[in-house]
Amino acid sequence: PIPLPSGIGLEACGVIEEVGPEVKLFKVGDRVSHASMPIGAYSEKHIMPENKLVPVPDGVSDEVASCVTLKGITAEYLLHRAYPLKKGDKVLYHAAAGALGQILCPWANSIGAEIIGTVGSKEKEGIAKKNGCHHVINYTDKDFVEEVEKIVGKNGIDVVYDGVGLKTFEGSIEVLKIRGMMVAFGNASGYVDTIDVKKHINAKGLFFTRPSIAHYTIEREELLESAKKVFNAVLSGKFKIKISKFGKIEEVFRLLFD
């Protein structure tokens, strides 16, 4: 738990106004972004350790960098390192209309994967399609396990990227192919507390990982390389960031609730 009182926010972009006497990596005037602790990004000024910051290239606006650093790095490590996605891979991605789906799905599409996205409402089906999904399943009115089998047959899915958790876990395991990969990176619907190795892993020789951004940016070189790939993907048009609302800092909470 975060000790209270506390600021909030983990992701921001801005220009450095002051540096400490031992700072070597950046100087006043550099434009940087971050996607990590210490918390407090939703503020006019924020003190950050230099090793958590990344340079923002020309051509990437402050607004886009503020939106893409955390989710972009997440998409990068999921697609390139947790499971290195290949052309022709069949992918199941849950919550495909969300903010991360806006980045990950078109990026996966650019690699040449076939993407099946799940959503939780009728209005989100079109969003998932725009995000690059070749097939969209609304799991509130259809069994996604049955629908996936209709699309790919009984051979199954190469990789499932599951940020939903408890609600989708069993079905995600079921649709994977022999030696498929389960990338469980979130728990929006609740935590999966127990994994039955015999039932969930051994039955099909599955691979399982529970990654987080901290695991994949533990070395500064990893953070820099990941951020570079993200910003290059933005500049090359592999995905586009849609920002629905802008506002002053004092309006942030109202905009979030709206």
Predicted regions mapped to residue ranges:
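Glycine-rich beta-strand-centered segment in the early N-terminal region that forms part
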Residues: 1-38
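C-terminal hydrophobic helical "lid"/dimerization subdomain
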Residues: 220-258
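Short helix-loop-beta connector
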Residues: 27, 58-61, 84-90, 154-155
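Helix-to-beta-strand junctions that scaffold the AdoMet/dcAdoMet cofactor pocket
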Residues: 86, 176-177
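Glycine-centered, small-residue-biased loops immediately flanking beta-strands
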Residues: 180-181
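Adenosine-nucleotide cofactor-binding segment
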Residues: 109-171, 219-223
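Mid-domain Rossmann-like dinucleotide-binding core that forms the NAD(H)/NADP(H) cofactor-binding site
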Residues: 69-141
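Rossmann-fold NAD(P)-binding glycine/threonine-rich loop
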Residues: 190-203
